[in-house]
Amino acid sequence: MKAVMVAAAVALSAGAVATCLLAPEYYGYLLGTLATTALVGVGLNVLLGLAGEISLGQGGFLALGAYGVAILTTKAGLNFWEALPLAVVLVAAISAVLSIPALRVTGPYLAMVTIAFGFIVESVSIEWRGLTGGASGLTGIPAPFGTGGTALLACGFCAVALVGFRFFAQSPLGLAMQATASAPAAARSIGIDPLPVRTVAFVVAAAAAGLAGGLQAALTGFIAPSSFPFSQSILFLLVVVVGGAGRMLGPLIGSAVVVFLPEVLAGLAEYRLLVFGAGLLIVLWLAPGGIAGAIDRLLTRKKLSSAFPANVELALAHIAKSGGSLRVEGVRVAFGGVVAVASVDVEARSGRITSVIGPNGAGKTTLLNLVSGFQVPDSGIVCVGSRTITAKPAHEVARDGLARTFQTAQPFANLRVLDNVRLGLLRGAWRGEAEVTLARALLALVGYSGPEDRPAATLSHVDRRLVEIARALGSAPDVLLLDEPAAGLNDSDTRKLGALLQRLARAGIALVLIEHDMTLVMSISDEIVVLDAGRRIAAGPPASIRADPLVKAAYLGGTTTVRPVAARAAGSRLLDVEKLSAGYGPIPVLDQIGLCVARGETVAVLGPNGAGKSTLMKCLSGLIRPVTGNIGFGGAALARLPAYRVARAGLILVPEGRQVFPRLTVAENLVLGASRRNDFDQSEIDSMLDRFPKLRARLHTAAGLLSGGEQQMLAVARGLLARPEILLLDEPSLGLAPAVAAELFGQLRKLREEGVTLLIVDQMADHVLAVADRAYVLGGGRVAAQGVATEMRDKMLDDTYFGARPAAVN
């Protein structure tokens, strides 16, 4: 393949030389235009293909470069060789200044900023007549050679830029750009500051456009504002997209399409643009990754390398620590009036595993974000060893010795596995082969045995976790924070993960683990800190935490004052779930779930965080499609129906987190609940207000201004107005004060007595068991126990929440 590439390069070079020196002048001009267009494309390929940012202002930078050369040669008396580098430096400086406000925004907002910049350049070039010649432009721009020679010079610059892009993309800075584009939060967690990285990409793209503009001015000998229309910036973007963003030859191929295709279609007269546009659409449809990407897939069948021999001891020596600890004192943060973390203290010592647990909404991930620099605490102190890292941004925290992983694994999907880990090696410059050897050793340490040159986007879920941990270890951290690393892993992989974490602790790293798998937590933790409603309620070794009544109350709800109801005889089956499996992409969550609900029955679904309760509710309501299994509802199959059709069938979800329409009033929210019905009567709203009297005084208030309890009552009332066959309630007590939760469950008890069919998922076992007829307990994505609600609070329930891993119940 390399021989073919070399032969093609030689042939193209020979053809370019022959065209510029021997062919008619117009063909030399076309080739020069191709080269300058490709040169702009190479720069934009750095910005879009590597850094993932869109600019529609490249025409403005092209104009600045062209006017710079024209003014310096025609008015300042400089020759071309003096004017060209000065013009490029000028464009780079202007782009660096522009990047200060422009790169505070990303995506479409950056595109709009650069569009405005292009219009400013056009306006200045028209109005500043004394310098730019106004609308008439500037003529007599000297060229270093004739048309053919100048075109050949442009081709030379283009060739150097294309080769330079190939090497730049694999450099540390190029990989950092790709990492920032792929997963900016993960990039910050390994010490990469996205702002300067994007700034460099922006300046490089602008400088390349300025260089192309200077060459274009010399090639044409004349420039005017009309030479740089806004449509040209769009064409430059098409050059990269059609050619293949991120591909070395993408800009060259895209430029050939944009420059030569209109010439080929010249005979079509007024239909030329129509056919040209249709052709571009067809190309984008057939090759969404660009022409270069399609060619690469057709011509290359790359065999992934097998695992290289690796020295695990080298990795252990790299991460070995003699000390270092994490100290968190009095950390507090509030969002609006809600205190998410309230004066929490945590100490994680070197060589020990400290786990942070708690029910949903306890503040665990918020605490981790405060410690790792992704959020700023209102008060408190965070220290790594003797270094205070309070309120430092995430990339500085990473450089101070604290690494982290994420709740959903975030490898850099567009990079190879090996490059993911290489980017984690922050402490010291890259060291060539020695750095590659160390990266391989880290992969071996965590247990990754797949190909090192596999794109991370193609990895299985467990391998994505392992690569993320290896990347975090690359910085040889003093403290490693792990946010639910066992989520989605099977029992075997979870046990291997536990052994790995214990090995890392023995190497001297202070590990902080946030995890819902209580079997893992109880088996490997040296100390456990328990949070509830943002407050620390307990701390100690696993045995004491498991027996602590405050911890049990936090998870199971304590002793409820609501008297349990007697189970009733089941009516006809209304909902029948068989062998249901589901997940999120490669992450399995539910495994062969089976349950049923009879008409008029209230059924509870319990289980610890991460057991799959909310995923089950999303499957039942059509929000996610199950992988396998059946959902029977009144004789109809719902498993493949979209959510709106499931709702029309009568399965109504009150989602987790309330999710009212915040800008609509309470009354408008209620009316929307009945929108699928043709027999809705306004008096039904009065009935709901009688059921939830607190809503009556807030009827014309925006729902977003209600308290949490009022929003939950509104969400339930909205669901009831749909007249559901079954009302699904997902964590209705989440985030509610105890008194408010008790009031809400009192209303659910009344609904049960009225014969409304309810399926309730909730963390507070005591409250929901006091209302339910029957209950299912989920553990590890499977049904761990089921039975009559009044008999369910036994050792099986405790084990599911606090550490035993029961076998599935069929």
What is the meaning of each model-derived region?
Residues 308-318:
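Cytosolic juxtamembrane regulatory segments of multi-pass membrane proteins
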Residues 1-310:
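Transmembrane alpha-helices and adjacent helix-loop boundaries
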Residues 15-16, 29-30, 79-80, 122, ...:
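A generic short-segment signal for beta-strand/edge and adjacent turn/coil regions
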Residues 4-5, 13, 21, 26, ...:
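Generic detector of short, locally flexible boundary/turn motifs and exposed helical patches
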Residues 322-327, 333-810:
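Glycine-rich phosphate-binding loops of nucleotide-dependent enzymes
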